[in-house]
Amino acid sequence: MSIIKTLSVGNGDMFYIKHGSDNFTIIDCNLIDELQEQIVEEIINEKKGKTITRFISTHPDEDHIHGLKYLDEKIDILNFYCVENEAIKEELTDDFENYCKLRDGEYHYYVYKNCKRKWMNINGDNRGSSGINFLWPITSNESYIDALDKAKRGESYNNLSPIFTYSLNGGITAMWMGDIENNFMEKVKDDIDWVEVDVLFAPHHGRESGKVPSDVLEKINPKIIIIGEAPSEHLNYYNGYNTLTQNSTGNIAFKNEQSKTEIYVEKGDYPYDKSFLKNEGICDCKLGAYIGTLMLEDK
């Protein structure tokens, strides 16, 4: 059993995965001031008993690293995963400086397509892996090299984002894309070995600017798309696909078991379609308000 949680942190991203193995993964960081202590306390409590904690940074935009210095001070990040880059910023913040310290420091690991690492996707020393696999970047790709150059000049960072999945044996596969932009994905989509997923966290918080191309959606065939907390006028609602909109759910927790995933939300009065979920009449109240179960019998 594992837990994926997408935290409601305003116009930004933050997730964690409490693996069934001896692993705990944090993805991005947007510790808005009023929730900073509460979220970090939750992370500290949830990762108790896990020997390995990793932080995956998709890219260094402020809404993905805000509060990173505070988090690092509280949990001491010893496994920092990011793409290899030389991003700079004209206006330095404490969090970007902390990002650079971790990116360039002793405990970084640079991710790329099909990278292998013990306990990330390789078992070892009687400890299971995390089930995390990277589909992108291909570091020799010309469009990606151009994105690296733009970050090195301090112009933009979104297209540094890796694409990766988390899979539970016999259960869920979820995909993250950071803030990859639509026009960039159109250039590189044919170079990526797409896999089918159950849950897609829409890139760029669900914005139209991050819309996943239709032919890519057909290949990954998501059962649910999670749309983030960008302003509603900027969102693409992925018509024709089952969605949960985090502006209306608040936090979302996925309790993953073989052949099914129970879904819990912060706001129990979620007003939109949930008919794609099976109501099993169960409740794990500490995770939130139960809204249904995504059945995965084909696993």
Each language-model region and where it sits:
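Internal alpha/beta domain cores that form substrate/cofactor-binding pockets in large enzymes
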Residues: 63, 90-92, 105-107, 185-191, ...
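Active-site-proximal beta-strand/loop segments in catalytic clefts of secreted hydrolases
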Residues: 28-30, 57-60, 83-85, 113-115, ...
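A metal-dependent hydrolase metal-coordination microenvironment
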Residues: 62-63, 97-125
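Hydrophobic/aromatic beta-strand patches that form the interior of the parallel beta-sheet core
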Residues: 5-7, 25, 56, 81, ...
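Residues at alpha-helix caps and immediate loop-helix transition turns in enzyme cores, especially N-
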Residues: 36-39, 67, 92-95, 212-213
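Short, flexible/disordered intra-domain loops and linkers
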Residues: 34-35, 87-97, 150
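Core dinuclear metal-dependent hydrolase active-site scaffold
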Residues: 1-50, 112-196, 253-299
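Active-site metal-binding motif and surrounding structural segment of the metallo-beta-lactamase
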Residues: 23-25, 34-87, 191-207, 218-225
